[in-house]
Structure formats: structure tokens, C-alpha cells
Amino acid sequence: YGEGSGQWRTITAHAADRYSVVAASLQLADRRGAVGETDLAAFLDGMHRLAQHFAGLIELPASHEVLTHARALDEFCAGVDVQLGVNVVDVAGNGFAGTKLRGLAEAAGLELRGDGLFHAVDEYGATLFTLGNLGPEIFDADVMRTLTTAGVTFMLDVPRVADGPAAFDRMVAVARQMAQSLGGTLVDGQRHVLSDAMIAGIRAKIGEIQQQMAVYEIAPGSARALRLFS
């Protein structure tokens, strides 16, 4: 807390203000699980040493309370950590040409990135959904010139998207257009043909998950959600 500014500020190497109160935080969970006793102890020890260095007073929560909270947070996150996919597969046995796939993806506004996936992004550059290969090869500009694949998969990472149902609608629209252009079929992960009713059910599930997150005060697609689901 800056004495001069009267506001909470992030401390950087070039900060010139004087601080009367400093708050430090530790992320309690991510996709690897809840924070453990060892990491928590190291964090608390570091805070003790920092306070001693500046002859300051320190307020710390009880370790067992933090660990209990971390486990509860991790359990909740695990319950809503869902990635939902829609596949477009070739049923004629000819395969999809990589050059045509790339053209269709780019025409739909998707960007090929270094992770081997096409990304649909919002106005801020955040990923809404991805398009990947069902085969072993990743998508790469050079590889796609000669690639032939039996199918592609569209994937939506539910906790990391602000408006999941809207992102899903766009994803399905692109998948349907691609299926029509390629002569493919929309199927789920078990290769069952996706009916309109099944697609509506998936959309409803996305909305339900994101509502649960909002109640837990983790806004889907927010900075907090991106930290927790990483």
C-alpha cells in the first residue's frame, strides 16, 4: 500500500513509493492440483524472513486452514474443468487435404499458431476454441501442404472462455460449414453422429458449468479462471 499514492500497487524493481503495508498471495490450486504442505511452508517461511528483514509485523493464516481451503478449491475446479469437442470425420475414405483444411479454417477467421492448432479468438486475442488434427501430425504450414487426414477436432475449454454458449455456437457453425465443404460428418468422441438435440444438450451443459463457476465467484474466462485452469 503506497503512502504517497494512497492506493494498492504492484511492487516492481523500479517502484519509487514507500509502502506501509505489503500483501503477498499464493495461488492455492491449478490443473496440477492443490498447493501442498511443502510449497505452503516455503511461502510462509519466505514471508517471515521478509518481515524480519524490514522489522515489520506479519499476519498469516493458519497452515491447516489454507490447506483445507486449497483442497476445497481444487475439488470444485476439478468438477467444472471440462473440455468439450466436436469432430468432423471423413466417411468416404478419401481423407481431407491439408491445403483445403487450412483454406477453410482461415476463411472462418481461425489463426494457425505454434502449438499446431488453429485458434478462434475474440477481439482481445483470447482463444475461444481450437481446431486440431485427429491424426498424429500437428498442423504446420509446411506439413499441411502434403497432409491428408481422416478427421479434425474442434475443442472448447469451458472454464477459460467468457461466454461458453456463444463460443460453442460459433464453433459448431464453423464445424458444420467445414463438414459441408469437405463432405464430412459431425461426430462426438465416440464417433456417434451428432444430432441437433445432442448439440443442444452440450450447449446447455456448458451454460450449467459456467453458472456454477459464477456462483463460486470464478468468472469464466477471467484472469482468475485462467490462472486456476492452467
What label would you give each PLM region?
Residues 70-73, 77-96, 103-230:
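Membrane-proximal, solvent-exposed terminal domains/tails of membrane-associated proteins
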